[in-house]
Structures are given as structure tokens and as C-alpha cells.
Amino acid sequence: MTNIRKSHPLLKIINKSFVDLPAPSNISSWWNFGSLLGICLMLQIMTGLFLAMHYTADTTTAFNSVTHICRDVNYGWMLRYLHANGASMFFICLYLHVGRGLYYGSYLYKETWNVGVLLLFTVMATAFMGYVLPWGQMSFWGATVITNLLSAIPYIGTTLVEWIWGGFSVDKATLT
């Protein structure tokens, strides 16, 4: 007599998707980090959109807009902390995901690995833009440290820094 989960038409679909999943027998919890990355990314996008609704572009009122979000917006303090800690969690999951790929030898699949490296560089560039270039609330320290890494590139480094900032160093909020 066959098991009902293997013979019933609807239960057979669920069984093949969840119970008898066609996955390697040595799969571990390390393989969850791709899904966790997606969850963290959705959290960042949603909280970022809600925070942007109460955002002030002027440098003189930037601190007041943060105070407004934390005090006057319903659960604004939670949005702010979820956004800040979600970014940290995103990068922790990202590095663990890459570490899992290194540990299990995923770099041997050249095309897949190259797509992953390209995605990693894209994430880093996006994080740079989100951390350094918000309207009126630029982090001077972050901008200086990150762009001074560009100045270490031989021959073109100083030219790159001057091109990005319009001068030798960061001066004011760039986008207001």
C-alpha cells in the first residue's frame, strides 16, 4: 500500500516540493543564507521607502528630520532601527553566503561564481551610494575613508577622487 502523500494528486506536489525535496543529502543550514539575503533586501527596501517619505534634503534641518521620524511618526523609531540593523544583517548574511561558496568549492563553477562576484560588486557600489550620498545627510567620515581607497589606485587614483568629489577631499553635502 502506497503512502497517501505519494499517491494523492495535490499532496504529491507538496511532497515533491517539501518532503522528498530533490536536494543533496549533505545540505546544511549554510544554504539558507541566499534566502536570508532576499528577506534582508526586502526589509531594506520597505523600511527605506517609508523613511524616505519623511526625509528632509536640507542640511540645516537634517537632524530635525531624524528626530521627527523617531518621535512623531508611528513606529518611526522601529523603522529607523530596522533599516540600520537590517543593513548590518544583510552584509553578515552576504559574507556568510560567500564564505559558504568558498568552503564548498562553488568557485569551480566559473560562470556562476563570476555572476556572484558581479553581484557582490554591485551590492558594494549600491551600499556606497546609500551610505555616502543621501541628499543633505552625507557621512563625511564614510565618504573620506571609502573614496580615499580609490586614491590608492596607481596612476589614476587621485584623478578618480577629484572627479568624484570635484576636488581633493569631501567638503559639503554633495547633492543639495
From Swiss-Prot:
It comes from the Eukaryota. Binds 2 heme b groups non-covalently. Pfam families: Cytochrome_B. InterPro entries: Cyt_b/b6_N, Cytb/b6-like_sf, Cytochrome_b_N_euk/bac, Di-haem_cyt_TM. It is found in: Mitochondrion inner membrane. Heme b b566 binds at H97. GO terms for molecular function: metal ion binding; ubiquinol-cytochrome-c reductase activity. The keyword Iron applies. The cytochrome bc1 complex contains 11 subunits: 3 respiratory subunits (MT-CYB, CYC1 and UQCRFS1), 2 core proteins (UQCRC1 and UQCRC2) and 6 low-molecular weight proteins (UQCRH/QCR6, UQCRB/QCR7, UQCRQ/QCR8, UQCR10/QCR9, UQCR11/QCR10 and a cleavage product of UQCRFS1). This cytochrome bc1 complex then forms a dimer. Heme 1 (or BL or b562) is low-potential and absorbs at about 562 nm, and heme 2 (or BH or b566) is high-potential and absorbs at about 566 nm. Belongs to the cytochrome b family. Component of the ubiquinol-cytochrome c reductase complex (complex III or cytochrome b-c1 complex) that is part of the mitochondrial respiratory chain. The b-c1 complex mediates electron transfer from ubiquinol to cytochrome c. Contributes to the generation of a proton gradient across the mitochondrial membrane that is then used for ATP synthesis. This is Cytochrome b. The lineage of its organism: Eukaryota, Metazoa, Chordata, Craniata, Vertebrata. The gene is MT-CYB.
